[in-house]
């Protein structure tokens, strides 16, 4: 009701994968489309929002990262570069001399806030943390709904106390990055348990996210008290997503997923590949901070891909990826709705 959408189905915002076309298709079908803008510059974020608004008159959400910025630990970085050096050398390359912070945080960049205030999408969501009070106040005054991901009750209560409108309950099954605020503490709660926990202790609407691929699963989450569901992995295969051919192929052929922090510096669930089998070992050095580690992973993947080795890609996927179906976004939304009604 707050979002004025027909169906309680959200497209998960996926940085690097979501496109204005995909967002618009979901919104035009009565769901809530989304743009994952955490990896964008303010200028490109603005362009994506305007393009989406040209493709749909319906509501959609935009998403940004609220990670705590940290200085690069030079010693950690050196050890990590040395550890990955053999993988670069295998392709006749050398790792870079230094690592860069490739993703600025919304917390440090009011240019992102100004883009949102200027373009006025219906809703804005945040991952890894909560925006500053002045940012929340500005969004509220502009009439823009705010949403933040929570992976545990402590985060959910902090979100509610901050004056945010909606809580996204991200379970351990979810593909991509854990929205966890403090990486040293992860209760690894599954989506269904998390939804019930937050519904019991908080008054805000809760959106269930993580491992949802079918209308039956969506219906189950709504039955537990969720106001809506958010799906990401199910939509990555759509033609209008920005996923590579290799990523799409992996979604349909490799149903094993694993959580690792070695790709980006933060824990994220993806399809099992070299990062999990060759890089992650009990004796490996501790990776540098997010997003410095991601800078290196992207460079290694680019080099390996030129040699037709796609095992270093960030093929994010949820734990139920085996249930993925080849459907275009409008058809997938319709199918989910039919399944939700059929299961009544």
Question: Can you say where each PLM-predicted feature lies in the sequence?
Answer:
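Conserved active-site-proximal phosphate/metal-binding subdomains
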Residues: 177-207, 212-344
